[in-house]
Amino acid sequence: MSLRIMVVDDSQATRRVVSALVGSRWTVCGSAENGKTAVKKFMELRPDLVLLDLGMPDIDGIEVGRQIHAIDASTPLILFTLSDPWGLEAPARKAGFTHVISKSEPWKLLDSIKEIVEGLERGHDEASGDTSKHGRSRRDGSVN
């Protein structure tokens, strides 16, 4: 699956590094340096996934995620932060985030994106009635 990802971080260096990291496997369709720009670009680009930094100068990443989730609740959101991710799980999930990842563990970012891609592919297969991978057809409930 060709996943289109938008990267949002106030640090240009972080945007570049993360874009290079995820861009080696998927398409980085855009980036933003603050929350207001992120919401605007989200509406223009309609990426398949949004990767958001927590600490931005205008609007924090959780609020940006909440706004994006209100526009399109089907778009997966990943919070990528220097803060302790454990304390952010509950508010992030409530705002619509699927994953909270520490910037000190970038390999977890790739694993989370892979997990999201697999989930999107499963959803596409089920919606189209493709039962070759999962053994059940959504249309009639029968087993292959």
Label the model's feature ranges:
Residues 34-37, 60-63:
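Acidic catalytic/metal-coordinating carboxylates
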Residues 53, 81:
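Active-site residues of response regulator receiver
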Residues 61, 93-98:
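As written
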Residues 57, 85:
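The feature encodes the CheY-like receiver
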Residues 12-30:
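Two-component/phosphorelay signaling modules centered on CheY-like receiver
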Residues 9-10, 34:
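Acidic di-acidic motifs
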Residues 43-45, 67-74, 95:
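Conserved phosphotransfer cores of two-component systems
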